[in-house]
Amino acid sequence: EDASDRTISMEKYGDTPVKRLSKFGLLNRKSILAHCIHLDEEDRKIIADSGAAVVYNFDSNLNNQVGLPQLAKLPQSVPVLCGTDGMNAKPHSTFRNLFLFGRHQGMSFGDAIALVKKSYFDQITFARHYFHDFPTLQQGSRADLIVWDYIPPTPFDQNTFWGHYLYGVLERNIHTVIQNGNLLMDHSRIQFPQDIYFNSIAVQGARLKQSFEKES
């Protein structure tokens, strides 16, 4: 993420982080490389040849003042995933930033939208490397669905979907959640007792805070 990661790696080991990972056989189609801000052309080729995925975490990059990845330089064959690096619980917001930063870096509107579409489907493909039963919308597939409470104010079709998705759908509340055919949320109301989960979250949150305080 930081330029210092690359600098220290070069000073201590004579190679970039990507080249070191490759040298030790740690790059393959199940590998996730986070951030990838400070890459050279050889790094990008190694990533592309390995089949590894790159995960962008723009909120973290901006918070840490380390710059942003050069989106257009990554080979098209490299899977692009959208993450948060723990900065929030809304990885879909990274989709919008992927579009905006693409535009900021000089991409045409069409190319920036194409990158968002690529990332959307790259994530589905990558998930199936780990979860072979990751569902589809085809008949007979496991019913894992989310329905947003969104009424489009302008024409909504295959040509306008991505604009609606980025600036309309993702701004709305979740209306329905179905997991394996079970209704978990209906009309934005969770359909099972939540207290036991929230209590556990509070306990684990306090434990995590204490562990960080001990380390510091």
Identify what each model region corresponds to.
Residues N63-P69, K90-T94, D157:
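Short, charged, surface-exposed secondary-structure boundary motifs
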Residues H35, Y56-N57, C82, W148:
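Conserved beta-strand positions
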Residues E1, F58-N63, D85-N88:
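Short, acidic/turn-prone active-site loops that include or flank metal/cofactor-
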Residues E1-A53, N64-V80, H132:
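Histidine/acidic residue-rich metal-binding segments in metalloenzymes
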Residues K23-L26, A72-P152:
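His/Asp/Glu-enriched, well-ordered alpha-helical/loop segment
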Residues K117-S216:
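Active-site microenvironment of metallo-dependent hydrolases
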Residues L33, I47, V54, D85, ...:
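Divalent metal-coordination and catalytic microenvironments
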Residues I47-D59, V203-S211:
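Short, electropositive alpha-helical surface patch
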